[in-house]
């Protein structure tokens, strides 16, 4: 069964279920993980029955016979076994897994009788993190501090303010604070805040396709926690990237190129970082942040390695007390370790029980926070390194990457070019723009060591073929090899056409199938401005007047009269700072009235015609819905 035949809602549920079983987070389910699942679920089943079910699932699911179940195989299990006893037991086990609260489906989209589950541990961890992050924010005094042992969190997110603040903490300046409604809130102004939060979350790469403002207002636990985890994770991972943290080059291994290191995901870099310090401590390496850290020993040695040694001015030494290592009881040992983490100000995300149970999500967050506070890495001085290769991604590249991630592509795109080199993400994007993909022609990971790149190249050739023949894109001079090798210009040419088609498709759906092009959008913008008696207009998406953002702001006010506070704007003789100030307000206001805008304020100031087109197209979509 191809992924394309699974709804977005169901896909999200399947991903959640998969993550619960895949405790080591390596992207595959092993025989042992299936066994552990049934044990953790405390189902009244005899041991031989658990063994039978596990063997049955492995036999049915492991289609390529590699001894593990991939996500695609997992989807097939769920569809192939829908009505069998094995399937029912499997689902029951997933829903009953310890620490998971199951609640009946209440969303209109969810079928009657489904169960959405959420983790008490996650709620506890996120509440403590948010309390600390927002403790001094006067706009959050009405809800902070929240009690982690109650449902405070699910009520607190209901007005959108906490979500907006957390998004800005993860990616500063995403939301213009002037656009958040803070005082005397009404159902309408709350709805605006939630629009602003959801559309801004989407713009930083959160997958929010199945989450509506109503879900957040009602505080639906599994949706609230899912969104918060994405926002928190983006913030935690922001600096775990070579171009933003050159000291990470210290993690280069012998015979490895800078390019190899740059391809690693934040999770892989964190594991590499932890093992770098464990190696220096003369300890065994770890292979994950779940089963391998359950005894707290790796954490103890990691804390000892990264704790300040007193050799930096103004940073006093912290000597980690290692005596807790001798504790016989795992929980007690974990508690002693966390007391040492607290001395570094890093007791966040995990309890002693989370460590001992090997909760992969919360342990990953704990490690990421420790890295951000105490990386304890030094940029190599003498190594022959091409520092020029370390340039960060451009704004346009970041926008494209965030757009893809917001659509829920799997795997997540961390590095635009290397993560597209097998075209799997591109095929998913084709499906989003209604270009059918023959998944039987697609090679899927894991790729063999010998000939693996040939498999990826075959995918890329098929991706270009689909673009030319099915999507009717202009791909002159672009071959599969260009995608496979990460040719920037040619890869961007394809991605832009995918994003443009996606944007126009939405407009065409709203307009009852009527074809849309640039001229139609420009004419609609000018007509709408004229009808609202606004003085601004645009001649094209390259019009220099767009650099003031006034045509965008006037259009927003035309679509939702009275929404723009013109007192906050500079309208004549603008310098660059004033233009940027207007643009920040414009982008946030567009999101606030319900337009899912991915562009950045700088795109308006610099009049980047591609991104300008997407802004006006999204606003046109919003305006047409209003009619």
UniProtKB/Swiss-Prot annotation:
<feature type="binding site">
    <location>
        <position position="66"/>
    </location>
    <ligand>
        <name>Ca(2+) 2</name>
    </ligand>
</feature>
<dbReference type="GO" id="GO:0051015">
    <property type="term" value="F:actin filament binding"/>
</dbReference>
<dbReference type="InterPro" id="IPR039959">
    <property type="entry name" value="Fimbrin/Plastin"/>
</dbReference>
<feature type="modified residue" description="Phosphoserine">
    <location>
        <position position="406"/>
    </location>
</feature>
<dbReference type="InterPro" id="IPR036872">
    <property type="entry name" value="CH_dom_sf"/>
</dbReference>
<keyword id="KW-0206">Cytoskeleton</keyword>
<dbReference type="InterPro" id="IPR001715">
    <property type="entry name" value="CH_dom"/>
</dbReference>
<dbReference type="InterPro" id="IPR011992">
    <property type="entry name" value="EF-hand-dom_pair"/>
</dbReference>
<feature type="binding site">
    <location>
        <position position="26"/>
    </location>
    <ligand>
        <name>Ca(2+) 1</name>
    </ligand>
</feature>
<feature type="modified residue" description="Phosphoserine">
    <location>
        <position position="5"/>
    </location>
</feature>
<dbReference type="GO" id="GO:0010737">
    <property type="term" value="P:protein kinase A signaling"/>
</dbReference>
<keyword id="KW-0472">Membrane</keyword>
<dbReference type="InterPro" id="IPR002048">
    <property type="entry name" value="EF_hand_dom"/>
</dbReference>
<dbReference type="GO" id="GO:0051017">
    <property type="term" value="P:actin filament bundle assembly"/>
</dbReference>
<feature type="modified residue" description="Phosphotyrosine">
    <location>
        <position position="124"/>
    </location>
</feature>
<keyword id="KW-0479">Metal-binding</keyword>
<comment type="subunit">
    <text>Monomer. Interacts with AIF1. Interacts with actin.</text>
</comment>
<dbReference type="Pfam" id="PF13499">
    <property type="entry name" value="EF-hand_7"/>
</dbReference>
<feature type="modified residue" description="N6-acetyllysine">
    <location>
        <position position="542"/>
    </location>
</feature>
<keyword id="KW-0963">Cytoplasm</keyword>
<dbReference type="Pfam" id="PF00307">
    <property type="entry name" value="CH"/>
</dbReference>
<dbReference type="GO" id="GO:0016477">
    <property type="term" value="P:cell migration"/>
</dbReference>
<feature type="modified residue" description="Phosphoserine">
    <location>
        <position position="323"/>
    </location>
</feature>
<feature type="region of interest" description="Actin-binding 1">
    <location>
        <begin position="106"/>
        <end position="379"/>
    </location>
</feature>
<feature type="modified residue" description="Phosphoserine">
    <location>
        <position position="257"/>
    </location>
</feature>
<dbReference type="GO" id="GO:0051639">
    <property type="term" value="P:actin filament network formation"/>
</dbReference>
<feature type="region of interest" description="Actin-binding 2">
    <location>
        <begin position="380"/>
        <end position="624"/>
    </location>
</feature>
<feature type="modified residue" description="Phosphothreonine">
    <location>
        <position position="353"/>
    </location>
</feature>
<feature type="modified residue" description="Phosphotyrosine">
    <location>
        <position position="28"/>
    </location>
</feature>
<dbReference type="GO" id="GO:0005509">
    <property type="term" value="F:calcium ion binding"/>
</dbReference>
<protein>
    <recommendedName>
        <fullName>Plastin-2</fullName>
    </recommendedName>
</protein>
<dbReference type="GO" id="GO:0031100">
    <property type="term" value="P:animal organ regeneration"/>
</dbReference>
<feature type="domain" description="EF-hand 2">
    <location>
        <begin position="49"/>
        <end position="84"/>
    </location>
</feature>
<feature type="binding site">
    <location>
        <position position="28"/>
    </location>
    <ligand>
        <name>Ca(2+) 1</name>
    </ligand>
</feature>
<feature type="modified residue" description="Phosphoserine">
    <location>
        <position position="30"/>
    </location>
</feature>
<keyword id="KW-0225">Disease variant</keyword>
<dbReference type="GO" id="GO:0022617">
    <property type="term" value="P:extracellular matrix disassembly"/>
</dbReference>
<dbReference type="GO" id="GO:0005737">
    <property type="term" value="C:cytoplasm"/>
</dbReference>
<dbReference type="GO" id="GO:0002102">
    <property type="term" value="C:podosome"/>
</dbReference>
<dbReference type="GO" id="GO:0048471">
    <property type="term" value="C:perinuclear region of cytoplasm"/>
</dbReference>
<dbReference type="GO" id="GO:0005925">
    <property type="term" value="C:focal adhesion"/>
</dbReference>
<dbReference type="GO" id="GO:0030054">
    <property type="term" value="C:cell junction"/>
</dbReference>
């Amino acid at each position: 069964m191809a992924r394309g035949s699974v709804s977005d809602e169901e896909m999200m549920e399947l991903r959640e279920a998969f993550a619960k079983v895949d405790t080591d987070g390596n992207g595959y389910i092993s025989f042992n993980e299936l066994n552990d699942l049934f044990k953790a679920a405390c189902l009244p089943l005899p041991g031989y029955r658990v063994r039978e079910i596990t063997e049955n699932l492995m036999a049915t699911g492991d289609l390529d016979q590699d001894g593990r179940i991939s996500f695609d195989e997992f989807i097939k299990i769920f569809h192939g076994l829908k009505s069998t006893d094995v399937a029912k037991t499997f689902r029951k086990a997933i829903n009953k897994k310890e620490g998971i609260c199951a609640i009946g489906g209440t969303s209109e989209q969810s079928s009657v009788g489904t169960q959405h589950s959420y983790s008490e541990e996650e709620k506890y961890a996120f509440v403590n993190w948010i309390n600390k992050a927002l403790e001094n924010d006067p706009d959050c005094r009405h809800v902070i501090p929240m009690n982690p042992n109650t449902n405070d969190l699910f009520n607190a997110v209901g007005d959108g303010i906490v979500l907006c603040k957390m998004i800005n903490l993860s990616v500063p300046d995403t939301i213009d604070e002037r656009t958040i409604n803070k005082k005397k809130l009404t159902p309408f102004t709350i709805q605006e805040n939630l629009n602003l939060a959801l559309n801004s979350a989407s713009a930083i790469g959160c997958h929010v396709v199945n989450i509506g403002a109503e879900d957040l207002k009602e505080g639906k636990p599994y949706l609230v926690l899912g969104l918060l985890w994405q926002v928190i994770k983006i913030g935690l991972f922001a600096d775990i990237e070579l171009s933003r943290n050159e000291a990470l080059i210290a993690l280069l291994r012998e015979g490895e190129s800078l390019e190899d290191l740059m391809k690693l995901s934040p999770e892989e870099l964190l594991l590499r970082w932890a093992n770098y310090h464990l190696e220096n401590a003369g300890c065994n390496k770890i292979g994950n942040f779940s089963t391998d850290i359950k005894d707290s020993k790796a954490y103890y040695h990691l804390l000892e390695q990264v704790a300040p040694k007193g050799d930096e001015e103004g940073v006093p030494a912290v000597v980690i007390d290692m005596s807790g290592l001798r504790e016989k009881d795992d929980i007690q040992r974990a508690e002693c370790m966390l007391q040492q983490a607290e001395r570094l100000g890093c007791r966040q995300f995990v309890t002693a029980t989370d460590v001992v149970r090997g909760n992969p999500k919360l342990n990953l967050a704990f490690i990421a926070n420790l890295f951000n506070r105490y990386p304890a890495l030094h940029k190599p001085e003498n190594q022959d390194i091409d520092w020029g290769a370390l340039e960060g991604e451009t704004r346009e590249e970041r926008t494209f990457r965030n757009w893809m991630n917001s659509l829920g592509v799997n795997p997540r795109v961390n590095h635009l070019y290397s993560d597209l080199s097998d075209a799997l993400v591109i095929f998913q994007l084709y499906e989003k723009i209604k270009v059918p993909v023959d998944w039987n022609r697609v090679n899927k990971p894991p790729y063999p060591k010998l000939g693996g790149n040939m498999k990826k190249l075959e995918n890329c050739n098929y991706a270009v073929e689909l673009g030319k023949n099915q999507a009717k894109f202009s791909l002159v001079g672009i071959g599969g090899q260009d995608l496979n090798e990460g040719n920037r210009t040619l890869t961007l040419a394809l991605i832009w056409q995918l994003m443009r088609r996606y944007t126009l498709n939405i407009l065409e759906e709203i307009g009852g199938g009527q074809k849309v092009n640039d001229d139609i959008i420009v004419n609609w913008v000018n007509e709408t401005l004229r009808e609202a008696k606004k003085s601004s207009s645009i001649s094209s998406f390259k019009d220099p007047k767009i650099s003031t953002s006034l045509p965008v702001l006037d259009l927003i006010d035309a679509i939702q009269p009275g929404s723009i506070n013109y007192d906050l704007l500079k309208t004549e003789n603008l310098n660059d700072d004033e233009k940027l100030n207007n643009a920040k307000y414009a982008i946030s206001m567009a999101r606030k009235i319900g337009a899912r805008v991915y562009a950045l304020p700088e795109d308006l100031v610099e009049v980047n015609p591609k991104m300008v087109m997407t802004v006006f197209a999204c606003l046109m979509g919003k305006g047409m819905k209003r009619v």
